[in-house]
């Protein structure tokens, strides 16, 4: 892999552990910077002008989804992204929140008493707190495993009353 430049966009992000995780994961081989601004368009332009990939956090996950040229299947199901990568075909969006939550739910379910297989075998109910990009990813992951999902948020948002399938459009 060629040497690239990577970063994180969102606001606020000064508290983020992403730089330390990225540095540890790639043993410091690639630069990773915080692009902190409340203006999504400014952050996105900085990505286009000087970065190969960026992690995306609140409040930009849904805005970044709209900007992507290519969407992973997870992103299409959720309507949000937490990772943008430049490719020869354009900017591709991924959602590792979805993949991580799905793996975790399967792992936790397998450890539950009277469970001898993955989470798709029995009815399980989960509560998702939050309806932003990460909450949507968690709900989609749980629903993909056949779990019954209840969503809760501190403020009422119109999309809370819509079935998750509507977000796939």
Can you say where each PLM-predicted feature lies in the sequence?
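Phosphate/diphosphate ligand-binding glycine-rich loop within oxidoreductases
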Residues: 2-111
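Short phosphate-engaging motifs
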Residues: 60-63, 134, 158
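Anionic-ligand binding region
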Residues: 145-169
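Glycine-rich adenosine-cofactor-binding loop
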Residues: 10, 92-98, 105, 109, ...
